Structures are given as C-alpha cells and as structure tokens.
A protein has these predicted regions:
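ATP/Mg2+-dependent ligation/transfer catalytic cores
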Residues: 1-194, 216, 355, 384-444
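C-terminal accessory/tail domains of diverse enzymes
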Residues: 2-12, 22-27, 41, 49-51, ...
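Short, hydrophobic beta-strand segments
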Residues: 94-100, 204-210, 257
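Short, conserved phosphate-binding/catalytic loop or strand-edge motifs used
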Residues: 134, 198-206
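Short beta-strand elements
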Residues: 147-156, 253-261, 318-320, 327-333
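Accessory "access/gating" subregions that flank catalytic or transport cores
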Residues: 165, 170-174, 178-192, 206-213, ...
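Short, solvent-exposed loop/turn elements at beta->coil junctions and helix N-caps
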Residues: 242-247
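Acidic/histidine-rich catalytic neighborhood
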Residues: 251-273
Length: 444
C-alpha cells in the first residue's frame, strides 16, 4: 500500500520521518520516527485531543471531548511526501489524515473539514481553485514578550524605517534569506511565485500559484514552517501574527478563489460569452451573507481584530467591486478564464485549511440558496459602516447562531472550535497588559 513511499525514502537516503498533522490552530503536531521503524509501522495513533489544543497548549472544557482520550487511526497521504531541507540529517515529512477506529474521518481534523467541503463541490461537478497570498513580518529576535518588536538589521547594517512598499532594494536587504526560502520551497515542491515588499517595516508578501484547494492548504501549512526555520537560520524571526507591531499594518492571507467545471475544465465563474456567470454572483452573495457570521475562521485570535481597521489595506466590510482594494471581496482584472474572487478578510494567522474551507462553504451556500450580491462598489468602501463583529467574543456568538455553517462544516467540529476559541479568550483575559499597568496603576 505504501511501497512508493518506502522506495522514495530509501532512494533519498532518508533516516527520519516527520509524521505531522495540522491541529485546529494550524500548528504541526505529530512524531519524528526513524525511517526503518516507519517502514515497519507506517500508520500511527494519537489521541483526538491533540487536534483540540488552544494556541497556548491548553484544552477546552467541553463535554464533547472523549473522556477516555482514545486514539485516532492516522494514515499518511502519499501526495504530501516531501524532503525537509533544513534538517541536519536526511529527513522527510508526511501529512497524516485522521480516522476513527471504525474507519470514518475524524470530523474535528482540519484537513477533513476541507475535504468535506470539496466533496460537496465534487458532487456538483466543480473543483475549487485557490491561490493564497501570504504576508508576514521579519523581526529582530525577541525572546521577551513584554518588549515591543523591532525590524531586523539588513545588509546595510540599518533597521528599516518609513514606508518601503514595493521597494526592490528593501527586499534585497534580506536577499540571502529569500534565496534560501525559495530554495527550501523548491525542494519541497511548494509552488511560490512573486515576492514583494509590503507597506509595513520589513513586511513581505509571497504569493502562491493557483491550484487544488487541499494541495494549496498543505503548501501554506508547510510554508509557514519553512519561512520560520529559514529566518531562524539567518538570526531573525518571521511572524505570521495578524498585527504584530503597533503603528504598522496587519498581515493577511488573501484567498483568490474560482471554480472549474470538472467536465470541460472551464472557469465556472464565466459564461460561454465571457461574461460573469450566475454562479459567480451567487458565490459572492454567499460570501456577503455568511462571512460576517463566520469570523472566528478568518480572525481567530484577539490580536486578529487589531488588523481590521480602516485605511490599512484591511477590509471593514463585505462589499465587492472590480479591482477595488477597499472592499472585502475584490474581483481582480482578468480574462474570462482567470475570473476569480479575492477574499481579503483572512488574517495570515488563520489555519489555512479552515479559512479556505469556510470561504468555499460560504460560496457554496450562496450557490445553493441562489443568493444575489449587492451592487459592486466603485468608490472608497472605508466610508461605509463597519460590517463585522468587533471582538472575538462577539464573533464566536454569531458563529454559534449560524446553523447553516454548523451543518455544512460539521456540528461537532464547529462546537469544538467554539470551545477552543472560548478557552483562548478566557486565557487572554487572565493576563494583565502593560497598558493597564501604565494607565490604571496610579491614576484610578
């Protein structure tokens, strides 16, 4: 069954295998196993609770958790076999899928959530195509979380200051790092494309080539590890926080999405005459209706909401428009075969499997409900009222009330996701911030 994997490991002289799976926050969990042991026992077991840790490593207080902490059956996906280029010894990585002892997919596994949505589209004769854009900051090493972050020192010996958007020389400040990142990505078959300098100090963006939604989610999952590891090697940090620094723009994961007709390979967002199809408009209608109700998948942490402010290239609404970067749903200029919708809501701190799954789920509901979008906006959308929940707590409550999303993503999964988010909010509010000590200690 796994002969191709075993042969690849032997041919490449692999000594260790990283057996990994994404948890509900997008962290890589799993085991590192000697190659010979992996070949003798390629399947693996881990408790489901591994998937359900908060970002701090705690567990939610939920009756939905298995009291016996029973194991899942884990099976490697051969298509995810890759070389780990930064490892000291020859190492491979494999992403595993999660099954219950009776062989059914574990509904709380993020990869299975995305597969569930892709199956719905498959039943309609459609294949979702996505292309994520990943923004992130480079920062100087900072082991003390109470100290504000600073940009790293580049080749000129200076920290970046001011605004350097699209400046090629500003990217070249860190040329050895980016050469290594691209080399690492190439060795892992991560199909990265354009590199640009974003608005913030040492804020960068790397785009992916478009492709299958599950494959791209896997690539983003591995890309985050890759960039962080390369940054460590060059004595700096790379952060995928949505809003890491005060006074600087936040970082997003924009999701370009379209639907291909499986039968003929054509873009289902375009009619035969090249005009936008009804499916295209229904998809936008679904995003407009359901994105505000599913914010925890696109802004999963308290910090995420600091990004969603006016005039910072982040959306404050779910209006749509042609080539309009002030709206939440932008339709880039493209020929009929390249027609797509850019969901600009997601922060780069999201779990890529869940953000892509939920974005596609919202569009799917729009198609099923035959929803029509509001008229496209050609003016500045920042002048419009804020259309999202303003806090994580409010967004959790709106998700709790959204039954169509519970049904399409899986009732138990959504309830467990809410439990994890509520636990994280509780943990956050136990921490007294420097702002509180500064202004309240002696003034109230």
């Amino acid at each position: 069954m796994y002969d191709d994997i075993f042969n690849w490991l032997k041919e490449h002289g692999i000594t260790e295998v990283e057996c990994i799976l994404p948890d509900i926050t997008g962290v890589a969990r799993g085991k590192i196993i000697p190659k010979d042991k992996f070949i003798s026992e390629p399947d693996m077991r881990l408790p489901e609770a591994v998937l359900l840790q908060t970002v701090t490593g705690e567990y939610p207080q939920s009756s939905l958790l298995d009291e016996t902490d029973a194991d899942m059956e884990l099976k490697p996906d051969q298509s995810t076999l890759r070389f780990v280029p930064w490892a000291q010894d020859p190492t491979a990585s494999l992403i595993f899928d999660c099954f219950s002892p009776d062989g059914l997919p574990v509904e709380t596994a993020p990869r299975n959530v995305l597969k569930r949505i892709l199956k719905l589209y498959e039943n309609m004769g459609l294949e979702p195509i996505v292309a994520p854009e990943m923004e992130f900051y480079l920062i100087s090493p900072n082991p003390d979380p109470d100290v504000p972050l600073q940009p790293p020192i580049g080749r000129t010996g200076r920290s970046e200051f001011g605004r350097r958007s699209y400046a090629v020389d500003a990217v070249n400040e860190f040329d050895p790092l980016f050469e290594e990142i691209y080399d690492y990505c190439h060795e892992q078959n991560l199909e990265v494309d354009t590199l640009i300098h974003e608005i913030g100090a040492a804020q960068m963006e790397i785009n992916f080539l478009h492709g299958n939604a599950l494959d791209l989610a896997d690539q983003v999952f591995l890309f985050k590890r890759t960039v962080r590891e390369s940054a460590f090697h060059h004595k700096m940090y790379a952060t995928f926080m949505a809003k890491p620094m005060e006074g600087e723009p936040g970082s997003a994961m924009h999701i370009h999405q379209s639907l291909n007709n499986v039968e003929n390979g054509n873009n289902a967002f375009s009619s035969d005459d090249g005009t936008p199809s009804e499916l295209f408009f229904h998809f936008i209608g679904g995003l407009q209706k359901y994105l505000p109700q599913t914010m925890p998948f696109f802004a999963p942490y308290v910090n995420s909401f600091r990004r969603l402010t006016r005039f910072t290239a982040a959306p404050t609404n779910v209006e749509w428009g042609y080539d309009n970067r002030t709206v939440g749903l932008r339709v880039p200029r493209a020929k009929a075969k390249g027609r797509r919708i850019e969901n600009r809501l997601a922060g780069v701190d999201v779990n890529p499997y869940l953000a892509i799954a939920c974005s596609l789920a919202c569009g799917y509901l729009g198609i099923k409900e035959q929803l029509q979008p509001r008229a496209p906006l050609s003016s500045n959308a920042y002048s419009l009222p804020y259309q999202f929940p303003t806090t994580l707590e409010e967004s959790i409550e709106r998700l709790r009330q959204c039954e169509p999303i519970h049904e399409i993503l899986g009732q138990r999964f959504v309830e467990m996701y809410i439990a994890v988010k509520e636990q994280e909010v509780s943990e956050y509010f136990r921490v007294i911030s420097p702002w509180e000590r500064k202004y309240l200690l002696l003034h109230v």
